[in-house]
Design a protein with these regions (language model features):
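Positively charged n-region of N-terminal signal peptides that target proteins for export
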Residues: 1-4, 104
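Formylglycine-dependent sulfatase
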Residues: 18-177
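Sec-dependent N-terminal signal peptides
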Residues: 4-12
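C-terminal segment of classical bacterial N-terminal signal peptides
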Residues: 12-18
Length: 177
């Protein structure tokens, strides 16, 4: 009796894992990653802030919150670390995008050999979209794609500005095609 029960459980679990394996490829969980510049840790309601942020609080409650992320004093090194999962120097963004210092950790953009989360997700069947400030392409590379634009680093669609600062009233557009 025990052999039959154990055999049934093993066969059942193999069958279930095969079905689950096929289903997971078709039903990827949705991933929404929000990065806000110039915001304090406790500015959001879900982190104890005084400002009401019910929609973000809902996403935080139903999803995953990062509470142990290394943040630099500058936005683009933090952005590069978040997009790649590497320390900013490993990703090529040790400082800012203002200049390519021709040193491996200070190229002013994400290194070509370091994959972004968008590239990994895209290659695994996800649709990848980004909106907002990119700010991980070296300044001066905005007129001609140089391999570091969002659509060249895994995002299928991108709506935003490439540089770190600018005017929402007079943005510098980048067009596809």
């Amino acid at each position: 009796m025990n052999r039959l029960l154990i055999s049934s459980l093993i066969l059942s679990s193999i069958g279930n894992s095969a079905v689950a394996g096929n289903a997971s490829k078709e039903n990827h969980p949705n991933i929404i990653l929000i990065l806000c510049d110039d915001m304090g840790f406790s500015d959001l309601g879900c982190y104890g802030g005084e400002v009401r942020t019910p929609n973000i609080d809902f996403l935080a409650e139903e999803g995953i919150r990062f509470s142990q992320f290394k943040n630099t004093g500058r936005s683009c090194p933090s952005r590069a670390a978040l997009l790649t999962g590497h320390y900013q120097h490993e990703a090529g963004m040790g400082w800012m995008t203002a200049v390519d210092e021709h040193r491996p950790g200070y190229r002013g953009q994400i290194a070509a050999n370091i994959p972004t989360i968008a590239e990994v997700l895209r290659d695994n069947g996800y649709a990848t979209y980004m909106s907002g400030k990119w700010h991980v392409t070296v300044d001066g590379a905005f007129d001609e794609p140089n391999g570091s634009y969002p659509v060249q680093r895994g995002f299928q669609k991108y709506y935003g500005c490439l540089s770190g600062g600018g005017s929402y009233y007079a943005p510098k557009p980048v067009y596809s095609g």
